[in-house]
């Protein structure tokens, strides 16, 4: 085991006694060295099965005032993650797996300013302090890695098929879209088409964004002590278009960042994480069997909620619990019907038998968004978005907007 690498990965917390105490407490209940070995084993299995490829390298080609555009769709997780082993480098404790969904999408524009001193972020028409902080964190690390001077402006817009919801991974789409727009701006089109390379930097904005850089089914390779440059996502399967899916969008005001910190304090966290490595090894051997993924998605949703409840955080609502009760009752009489949810009360359902979904919906009158595999809807919005972004950049030619955030 590369202990030097592991020492480097935790060096960022040396000045923060609370983080150091938490890390020590977690390590006392989890075999970090064993998780590292299991992660290395998974990496080798990915190589052997042809899923893994070394991230490519690109040279920066910056042009002052250059504007680039990108899009992304969100994901729905089967093998989930909560909690970072290395928050500074956004390295999770375990690998995670998801599929792309079309419940929303995100468009992003990125402008480079050679002499700029302050990055700016406008999300859905407003200067957004939360995403500004996330962007600044990611951009500072990005600029340091490639010795880039200057600043970047982002104009971002989300397009939803619902009014308001939590747990539909909008942040993953934002992270992947802004990362691809940035990569396109700095390295050009070839780099922007490299989903693995894009996923490396989407990770710095949002962990789930790593997987949103890919279409189909993807896995984020992450584990304690790994080289942060290898902490990327890989496509492990195409979308199974025979699988019907949809979601009941529900809203809550639970902050995901809060869920991350609560999860790692749970007495059940170590067991939950260790089980994931066994699941991923089996999935690789079985070529990511979709039926296994669907079952894992169900079980992992229940475990995730148990872990958060053990820390006093309840992410479900009366509405989502009512739907979940109906789902469990329906499942007891119907095989081939699956469900899952991420860090929020929006519950997704799946089945290869369309009639099962139709039958279930007859007894549940809540708003329902039917999923599809048509990921070209962004094209209908891109022209107007490009015009809006260009108008915005023209109106804000590069003044320091820090005071507005």
UniProtKB/Swiss-Prot annotation:
Reactions that this protein is recorded to catalyse: (R)-3,5-bisphosphomevalonate + H(+) = isopentenyl phosphate + phosphate + CO2
Molecular functions (GO terms): carboxy-lyase activity
Enzyme Commission identifier(s): 4.1.1.110
Record keywords, A-Z: Isoprene biosynthesis, Lipid biosynthesis, Lipid metabolism, Lyase
Pathway(s) the chain acts in: Isoprenoid biosynthesis; isopentenyl diphosphate biosynthesis via mevalonate pathway
Family matches, as InterPro entries: GHMP_kinase_C_sf, Mev_decarb, MVD-like_N, MVD_Decarboxylase, Ribosomal_Su5_D2-typ_SF, Ribsml_uS5_D2-typ_fold_subgr
Disulfide bonds: none
Alphabetical GO biological process terms: isopentenyl diphosphate biosynthetic process, mevalonate pathway
Signal peptide: none
Quaternary structure note: Homodimer.
Primary role: Catalyzes the ATP-independent decarboxylation of (R)-mevalonate 3,5-bisphosphate to isopentenyl phosphate. Functions in an alternative mevalonate pathway, only present in extreme acidophiles of the Thermoplasmatales order, which passes through mevalonate 3-phosphate rather than mevalonate 5-phosphate.
Family recorded in the similarity comment: Belongs to the mevalonate 3,5-bisphosphate decarboxylase family.
Additional observations: It is proposed that Thermoplasmatales adapted the classical archaeal mevalonate pathway by replacing mevalonate 5-phosphate decarboxylase (MMD) with two specialized enzymes (mevalonate-3-phosphate 5-kinase and mevalonate 3,5-bisphosphate decarboxylase) in order to produce isoprenoids in extremely acidic environments. It was found that at low pH, the dual function enzyme MMD is unable to carry out the first phosphorylation step, yet retains its ability to perform decarboxylation.
Stated name of the protein: Mevalonate 3,5-bisphosphate decarboxylase
Species this chain originates from: Thermoplasma acidophilum (strain ATCC 25905 / DSM 1728 / JCM 9062 / NBRC 15155 / AMRC-C165)
């Amino acid at each position: 085991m590369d202990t030097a690498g592991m020492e480097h990965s935790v060096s960022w917390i040396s000045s923060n006694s609370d983080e150091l105490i938490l890390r020590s407490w977690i390590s006392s209940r989890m075999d970090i060295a064993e998780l590292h070995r299991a992660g290395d084993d998974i990496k080798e299995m990915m190589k052997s099965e042809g899923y893994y490829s070394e991230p490519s390298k690109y040279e920066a080609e910056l042009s002052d005032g250059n504007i680039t555009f990108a899009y992304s769709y969100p994901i729905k997780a089967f093998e989930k993650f909560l909690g970072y082993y290395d928050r500074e480098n956004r390295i999770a404790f375990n690998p995670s797996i998801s599929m792309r969904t079309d419940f929303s999408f995100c468009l992003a524009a990125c402008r480079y300013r050679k002499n700029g001193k302050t990055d700016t972020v406008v999300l859905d028409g407003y200067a957004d302090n939360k995403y500004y902080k996330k962007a600044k964190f990611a951009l500072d690390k990005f600029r340091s890695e490639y010795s880039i001077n200057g600043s970047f402006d982002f104009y971002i817009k989300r397009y939803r098929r619902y009014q308001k919801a939590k747990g539909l991974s909008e942040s993953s789409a934002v992270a992947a879209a802004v990362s691809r727009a940035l990569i396109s701006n700095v390295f050009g089109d070839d780099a922007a088409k490299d989903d693995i390379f894009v996923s490396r930097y989407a990770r710095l904005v949002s962990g789930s964004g790593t997987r949103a850089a890919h279409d189909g089914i993807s896995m984020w390779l992450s584990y304690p002590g790994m080289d942060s440059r290898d902490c990327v996502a890989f496509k492990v399967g195409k979308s199974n278009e025979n699988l019907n899916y949809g979601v009941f969008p529900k809203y809550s005001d639970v902050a995901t960042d809060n869920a991350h910190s609560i999860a790692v304090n749970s007495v059940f966290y170590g067991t939950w994480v260790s089980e994931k490595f066994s699941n991923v090894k089996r999935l690789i051997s079985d070529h990511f069997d979709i039926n296994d993924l669907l079952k894992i998605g169900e079980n992992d949703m229940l475990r995730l909620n148990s872990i958060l409840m053990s820390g006093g955080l309840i992410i479900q609502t009366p509405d989502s619990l009512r739907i979940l009760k109906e789902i469990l009752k329906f499942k007891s009489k119907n095989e081939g019907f699956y469900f899952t949810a991420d860090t929020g009360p929006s519950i997704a359902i799946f089945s290869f038998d369309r009639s099962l979904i139709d039958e279930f919906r007859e007894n549940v009158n809540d708003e329902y968004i039917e999923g599809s595999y048509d990921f070209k809807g962004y094209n209908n919005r891109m022209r107007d978005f490009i015009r809006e972004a260009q108008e915005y950049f023209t109106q804000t030619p590069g003044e320091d907007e820090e005071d507005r955030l």
